[in-house]
Each structure stands twice: as C-alpha cells, then as structure tokens.
Amino acid sequence: MKRELEGSYESERKRGVAQVKAEYVVGAASNVRVDEEEAGSERFVQGEFGGKKNKKKRGQNKNRDNRQQKETHALCPKYVLADVTNQVDLCTFGDNCRFVHDIPTYLEHKRPEITDSVFKTCPVFETLGYCPMGFKCRFLSSHMDKETHKLLGEYPSDLASASHEINHITQDQKYDLIKKRFPFSKSELVLEILDSFQEENREMHREAEKVKEDQQDNEDEQKEKAPQVVQRELEAQKRRQRQKDLYLQYKDTRFFAQEKKPLDLRHKKIVSPLTTVGNLPYRRLMRTLGADVTYSEMALAVPLVQGTNSEWALPKAHESEYPGFGVQVACSKGWQASKAAEALATYIPNGISEINLNSGCPIDLLYRQGSGSALLDNPARMIRCLNAMNYVSGDIPITVKIRTGTKEGHPIADTLVRRLVFETDVAAITLHGRSRQQRYTKVADWDYVSQVAKALRQAEADFMESPQGKESHHDEKTRHTQFVGNGDIFNYTDWYQHLEDPEVDSCMVARGALIKPWIFEEINAQQHLDKTSSERLEILKTYSKFAMDHWGTDEYGIALGRRFFCEFMSFFHRYIPVGILERVPVQLNERPPLWKGRDDMETLLGSSDVKDWIKLSEMFFGPTEDSFVFTPKHKSSSYK
C-alpha cells in the first residue's frame, strides 16, 4: 500500500502538480499558464510598431492597452500648488490655456475624495510633510484648510530632490539629447577605434583579390576623373589612413579597460530586471524585504539617446536602492550601446552601481531588430557593444546578462564566456539557464549553469597566463569576473543548493520574488515562512503606499498605481500558503488544484479573477474610477 501511495505521489509530482491538503482542495488542477514572455512584455509587441501582428500565443492578450485616462477638467500645472489668497495670473497662456485656472471651480468638478481606504490621510503628505499633487490630491482634505482653501505643509524649492528619488535629469539635459547638442565625444572616439579594427580585419580578407584590384586601379588612373570623384577618393584615403593610425596605436592594448568602482555581488540578494512589474515601487518594496541589488526595467538605447521622457523615467530609483542599483540597456549596435552608456554616465553618474547589457531578452520584436538574445548569435557585435560601453562609462562597471543560447539543444554560453574574458573587461556575467527558444516552458538547466561557471574560471586562469593577461593585470595574481546564476529560484533550498558551487558568486531571483516577495527573508532565516493573509495584505499596503509616493495621489496617479497593483497581483496571487501544502518546497513550475485558504482573505489573495484584484486594490486606492481599464496578460478575464 505504501508503495502505491509513493508511486501516486511521484506520478503527481511528475505532472507538475503542487500537493495541497485534501481539506483545502475545491476542484481540479487550476489552469495556471506558463509565461512565454518576460513579465509585462507588451511594451514590445509587434502590433504597436506597425507591420503584421503576431498570432496570439496560448491565450495571451498580446496587444493589451492599459493606459489610463487623465482628468476631463484638469487643473493648470501652474496652479497645482498655488496660493489661493494671491490672485496673480500664474499662467502665461492666460485665457488661451486649455486647463482650469479657477481653483474653486476645479474643486467642484473634481472626483470625490478617497475616504474608504486603509489610508485615512494622504500617505505622501505623511511621509514628506507636503504633497506635490497639491489641489489635485485625492486625499486633499488632509492637507488643505477647508475654510481658506490654503494648502498645508512646507513645500521645498526643488520637489524632485526632496522626493527621495534619484537619477532625475533636467529638461535642459533632455533637450540637449533631443536637439542633438550632446557631444558624445568619448563615443565618437571609441567607435572610430572599433571601426578601425573591423576595417583592418576586412582588409586582411581582401588580400587575395588585391592584385586584381591594383590592375583595375591602374586602368582607372589612366582615365580622367571628375573633380567630385577625386575629392571623395581623397576623403576616403584620409579616413582610411586615420583608421590605420588608430589601429596601430591601439592594436596591442586593452583600450577599453578603465578603472571602475568596485562591484561586489558575492552572495548578494539580487532581484532580476523585470519589464513593467519591476518598477520603482516594487524595487523599493523588495529593498525593505531584504534585497541587496535591484535593476531598472530594460531601457532601449535609442530612445535614451533621443531624450525620450518615458525611457529616461526607467533609470530613476529610490534613494534606498543605491548603492546596488543597476540600469539595464538593450541595443543592437555598438553606437547605440556607447551613446546610451555615455549619456547615463554623464547625467546620473552618482546613482548607478552598474550598467547592464541585456543579451538575453527573448521577445520576438527585439530579437528581429538584433537586440536582446539576438546578440548571442553575433558574439563579435556583443563584444563591440560591451567594449564601447566600458570605454565611455567612466568609473561605472559594465555587466552583461545572457542565456544559454538562442536554440534549444545548442548552448553556446560556455564558449562565449571565454571570449568575454579574453576580449572584454566586463565586471560580471549573469546567465539565465534557458535558451531563447525555451522561454519558460521548461525548467532552468542549472547543471549547464555550473558548467559555464567552471568554463569561466578556467578561461580566467588561461587569460592570466597569457601575455595579454600578464601585461594588463601585472599587479594581480588572479582575475575574477563575478558570475551570477538565474532561473527558477523559488525558495531558500534552491538558493543554497546553487551557491554550493564555489564558482557561482550569487543567484538572481525573478518570478520567485514577484510571487513571494519575502523570499530573501526565507533565505536569511533558512525556513519556509508561512505568511498569514494579514502579513501578505500588509505587503500590498506597503506596495500601494510606495506606488502613491512615486506616481502621485491625483486621479491619474491613483489609476496608474491601481494598474500596476493589478500587474503585481497577476504574480502575487500564485503563491500557495505553506500551511495548506502536503509537502514543501513547491517548485516554480508546479501548479495547484483549485484551493481555498484558511480564511476568506487568504482565499481572496489567491484568486486568479481580475475582479478580485480590483476589489483588493479598492482597499488601498479607493473605489475604482469609471474610466479604469485593466487587461491581464492572459485572456482568462479582464476589467473595464
């Protein structure tokens, strides 16, 4: 009988079903879908950029649009913090302004205040002593004199610096990028150097045909040439001569190697870069729960170079994130990588611990453009990007995140890391133990991650014995490129098991930290923590407060905070309480039968219905706005 039970248990486990105690089971296995894309990857859907739209995969809402509407009767920005006792016309547009100038009129048309939230007063005002949303705040009565309509609190002259957020850039700095006034002097030089190396390689391959070309050149010289042709040839000769001079000057040097700030990732608790859900409030939450290192959402290099507002919002961080905050950049060419890194290093040098090149993103659109994991198919281009970034980034270290390869069954990371050691000066390499083709359909291959870590250490030893290594590291006995593993870490046993490998410096946690944000507390305690529904609700309250601190407490900020709250819930609800499980730990790819919690709130927190996520959001953000729209990633349900 015991064998039969064990066989049944193993059979269930093989099917990837989490074992829930019988008294909590209410139905068959739930239909939890495996994510084939990075979290929140709708930013990069083909349909948004024109051309043919992809076929929808596995019931995903690939073209969802969760942008929120703004106020119908919006208050003029010049009057948001105005003194109502002073009737001076603050707006230069006067009667031509499309916004409301009369504050009492605005307050009459404004949406009702939020009164039935767990926040009884404005959470931003409680934190800062003032509310930057002024009259637009949905908790206005907590910081406005009802009789005089005068705002309470002391307002600093520089609201941005007083918000406890870092990495802001000025409007003038953005205009320099938009108007192409930013000099990019370092980028221009390093790109010339890299071009000279490429041209020299091309010339070496053309040697076989040089005789034929010389004969043709002699015939052409006998013919009379137009002045414009002669001028172009002279310019080409000068350009080629400069390339040769640069090549001779730098060919025997590691010109890209620069002195950098120390980067220590050894056994650090690292949260992976996460598109959409890895926003500032979430990262700030993770810092309070034990994370040591956080990364921005993936920023695209070209919009950064162009000064796009939405892209420059991504490197912003809370002051609690630094040191230990990295900015991740995606690009397809060396000039994009170089100029984006130079702009970041010039404008926000004191708020970044590292700049990370994304060479692992599997999203189709970016892959077709040559970004993300497409760089795995072109290691030479990846190396040029890394070297250009390293040259221009000042003292900010450059790191790279890769996958095992692009095709399943054809891993290339073990050979790639050798080239990265010999041909670049990256401070750290993060390896996600899946190929691009796999996405999340199979478990991460940690045996291969371990194999790559050993290959990296062997490459470092070989490099130090080479003439190049002896010359460039003559004061050091060893070279250590930090190596971080990534994939399917969901509990403390996973963490410590992977760190038993001495060649692995640390582990990076992605979906595990979304489903279970207290995972680093478990790692420190070395226990499977059974969080109660009230404790999990407190985590959501903290996230909601951080969301309002960041996006604001006006109508638009509340809608935006609610939207990202629902994005967070799309992962957070997948947690299965330890107390209702037959066995622990549960693996990330295991799904439970339909279950009920130990109390009503626990059941609500585990619901996959978007309407229940909205219900939870109303506890913190007040009643849902009529215009609020949220479409989840999967087509199981939506809210309008």
UniProtKB/Swiss-Prot annotation:
Residues 202-215, 222-236 have a biased composition (Basic and acidic residues). A zinc finger (C3H1-type) spans 70-104, 116-146. Catalyzes the synthesis of dihydrouridine, a modified base found in the D-loop of most tRNAs. Specifically modifies U47 in cytoplasmic tRNAs. Catalyzes the synthesis of dihydrouridine in some mRNAs, thereby affecting their translation. GO terms for cellular component: cytoplasm; nuclear periphery. FMN binds at residues 273-275, 328, 401, 432, 486-488, 510-511. Coiled coil: none annotated. Residues 37-70, 202-236 are annotated as: Disordered. The gene is DUS3. It is found in: Cytoplasm; Nucleus. One of its GO terms (molecular function) is mRNA dihydrouridine synthase activity. Residues 52-61 have a biased composition (Basic residues). The keyword Repeat applies. Its EC number is 1.3.1.89, 1.3.1.-. It comes from Candida glabrata (strain ATCC 2001 / BCRC 20586 / JCM 3761 / NBRC 0622 / NRRL Y-65 / CBS 138). It catalyses: 5,6-dihydrouridine(47) in tRNA + NAD(+) = uridine(47) in tRNA + NADH + H(+); 5,6-dihydrouridine(47) in tRNA + NADP(+) = uridine(47) in tRNA + NADPH + H(+); a 5,6-dihydrouridine in mRNA + NAD(+) = a uridine in mRNA + NADH + H(+); a 5,6-dihydrouridine in mRNA + NADP(+) = a uridine in mRNA + NADPH + H(+). SUPFAM superfamilies: FMN-linked oxidoreductases (SSF51395). This is tRNA-dihydrouridine(47) synthase [NAD(P)(+)]. It is an enzyme of class 1 (oxidoreductase). Pfam families: Dus, zf-CCCH_4. GO terms for biological process: mRNA processing. Gene3D superfamilies: Aldolase class I, Zinc finger, CCCH-type. The active site is at residue 361. The keyword Lipid metabolism does not apply. Its main location: cytoplasm.
